[in-house]
């Protein structure tokens, strides 16, 4: 009799625990629809481009490797019909457009991600120092941030690219990172200013923890959504500036990219000639990338801000 009662109670407690776990999982802020959609689209796009480089012939990116001016599959252009050998068509130099995208998209995203990562590291150091230490340190960092933020990144990069026309991957990432640290610095400074008066920070100070321990062990874990959001926004900004420079014809021609592809299409009057796939498909890919990064950033803002979640 007692064993049956115990079994009933244990089964009830197990059911209650399962229901509690389900409710917790459903109410988790990380199940934000915008965040999930944006991350899924971006991951699928990156995964397809990376896998495609192993299963697709990368030599088709070379000039003259394919027939000229082929339209995509299912279309006809000047009595030429698209084939599955070149499903997205070719340009007027005989380069396969699918190969240009498979090689160019990871290259552009890689530069943007590295630039944003460097900018985020600088932003963490400056933002934490300005917000937590305050005083002269805060004044100097704010002045430096406000001054450099007003400098147009595109103009500076145009000047630099005219001097260094064939800047490689890491040089370009370093140049872009010079304009990617200001936003995380300002955001993190504001967050640290509001957090440093919280109870757990005061408790850590009373326990004898150093400033570095308080900033990077106590505060930083609570800022993870903000950090990822800033990294995402920085990547989007860096890729946008990079594409802008390349579309103007000032990017490095040594490696295919979406910006260089658009520049070649513009210079060859692809729009007037009716070669819509040459400029249209890379533009759509870029729009999808920017929209997915925007959804990730907005979703992370809602994860870290309960007021936005409840609206």
Description of each model-found segment:
Residues 87, 91, 118-123, 128-195, ...:
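Generic hydrophobic transmembrane alpha-helix motif, especially the helices
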Residues 106-122, 212-244:
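Transmembrane alpha-helices
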Residues 1-120, 124, 128-129, 136, ...:
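Gly/Trp-centered helix-boundary motif
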Residues 22, 26, 90, 98, ...:
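Alpha-helical membrane-protein architecture signal
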Residues 158-159, 173, 180, 227-261:
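Non-cytoplasmic
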Residues 149, 162-163, 192, 241-281, ...:
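Glycine-rich helix-loop "coupling/hinge" segments at transmembrane-helix boundaries
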